[in-house]
Curated annotation (Swiss-Prot):
The gene is argB. GO terms for molecular function: acetylglutamate kinase activity; ATP binding. It is found in: Cytoplasm. The record marks K8, K217 as: Transition state stabilizer. Coiled coil: none annotated. It comes from the Bacteria. The lineage of its organism: Bacteria, Bacillati, Chloroflexota, Chloroflexia, Chloroflexales. This is Acetylglutamate kinase. Keywords: Amino-acid biosynthesis, Arginine biosynthesis, ATP-binding, Cytoplasm, Kinase, Nucleotide-binding, Transferase.
Length: 254
């Protein structure tokens, strides 16, 4: 099988119908096997607020009570996932909408950063890579919502979509993980940095050049390299084919 592309698209980007149309247009011309992981973002928050529940985040992670989990699952596995699948199928792509619950595709354990209880927030511990590879050999494009099955309690968990993409890319091995963002890559003085090593990433984080929501993305990029992804990039839609910032190991960067 050719190098597998794992695309991660944020929910914020998917709020824009023009973005989804553009993404679909690019995907239909790509010849490599693809897996698409998506987030939920503002659409989840809006539904939570409409239900009269608080919207809380800790270090970028959504505090997920059982009530919030039910809403999150409805939105991200339902309306968002099916909106993406519909657009792709209408463009001639054999897209299959899934979450990590389906066939136990993603299993997880509770995530407790610094001992903080965030509720039903999980960290992926297992990916059914064989099932994903089988789908790809059939010519299908799995579209995966970031909900996983708790290994110990059998409950559904909210999992950060960047972490899901990183785990899938690492499990599949010969993959290129592509974070499709609203920026053309990692910017330094307004210019895209074409290549970054782990050491350079840590220096940029320490100096504040890389900050905010870009930090978890670059950390997921490095984690995917450690787990076996062949290549990791952060791009915008225009640079999806070969643009953006490519993350490389220290050896490759020297």
């Amino acid at each position: 099988m050719n190098t597998i592309g794992v695309l991660k698209v944020s929910g914020h980007e998917l709020d824009d119908p023009h973005f989804l149309a553009g993404l679909t247009g690019v995907i239909r011309t790509m010849t490599q096997p693809l897996v698409l992981v998506h987030g939920g973002g503002k659409e989840i928050s809006a539904a939570v607020e409409q239900a009269g529940l608080p919207v809380e985040f800790v270090d970028g992670l959504r505090v997920t009570t059982p009530e919030v989990m039910a809403i999150m699952q409805m939105v991200v596995c339902g309306s968002i996932n099916k909106r993406i699948v519909t657009a792709l199928v209408n463009a001639g792509v054999r897209a299959l909408g899934l979450s990590g619950l389906d066939i136990g595709l993603l299993r997880c354990e509770p995530y407790r950063p610094n001992g903080r209880d965030l509720g039903r927030v999980g960290v992926v511990t297992e990916v059914d890579g064989a099932a994903l590879r089988h789908m790809l050999t059939l010519g299908w494009l799995p579209v995966i919502a970031p909900v996983a099955l708790g290994s110990a309690d059998g409950l559904s968990y909210n999992v950060n979509a960047d972490m899901v993409a990183e785990s899938i890319a690492g499990t599949l091995g010969t993959t290129e993980l592509i974070f499709v963002s609203n920026v053309p890559g990692v910017l330094v003085d307004g210019q895209v940095v074409p290549r970054l090593t782990p050491a350079a990433v840590e220096d940029y984080i320490a100096s504040g050049v890389i900050s905010g929501g870009m930090i978890p993305k670059v950390r997921s990029a490095l984690a995917a390299l450690r787990r076996g992804a062949t290549s990791v990039r952060i791009v915008n839609l225009a640079g999806l084919r070969d643009g953006g910032t490519r993350f490389v190991t220290e050896e490759a960067g020297s």
